[in-house]
């Protein structure tokens, strides 16, 4: 076992001395030592960028075949903050208590669970908290 380890180390020393003689520079060798780390870092960034999709505001969300949505093939699922008349509700409208027309889960109005100004009943805490802290369930 010790012989194998010495053999591997001697091969490494031979390779290192060959590299030194070829490059005639220690700075190149220093940078070559970091090459596997740099390659690994770039590979990790590359796989992360392709493995986890990021949906930003205004980006089209692909839902596949749209023929089953209300008979309308041109349904636009973009989330545009400036589009106030959109029945889906923009993110800012949802945070302010807007409604979202959820076509994927049976339609109707889906309440966001945040502050709802028109909510008339309490939240089940007996006045312990203000009414704006709702439970988030559909009432």
Curated annotation (Swiss-Prot):
Chain spans, region Disordered: 61-139
Compositionally biased region (Polar residues): 90-103
Membrane-spanning ranges: none
Biased composition (Acidic residues): 64-85
Similarity comment text for this entry: Belongs to the immunogenic miracidial antigen family.
Full protein name: Immunogenic miracidial antigen 8I'
Organism listed in the record: Schistosoma japonicum
């Amino acid at each position: 076992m010790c012989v194998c380890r010495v053999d591997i180390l001697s091969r490494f020393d031979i390779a290192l001395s060959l590299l030194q003689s070829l490059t005639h520079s220690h700075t190149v060798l220093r940078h070559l030592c970091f090459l596997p780390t740099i390659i690994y870092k770039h590979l990790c960034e590359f796989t992360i960028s392709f493995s986890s999709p990021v949906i930003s505001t205004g980006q089209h969300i692909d839902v596949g075949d749209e023929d089953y949505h209300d008979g309308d093939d041109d349904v636009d699922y973009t989330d545009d903050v400036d589009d106030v008349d959109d029945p889906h509700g923009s993110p800012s409208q949802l945070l302010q208590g807007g409604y979202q027309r959820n076509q994927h889960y049976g339609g109707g109005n889906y309440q966001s669970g945040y502050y709802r100004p028109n909510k008339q009943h309490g939240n089940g805490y007996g006045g312990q908290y203000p009414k704006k802290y709702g439970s988030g369930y559909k009432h």
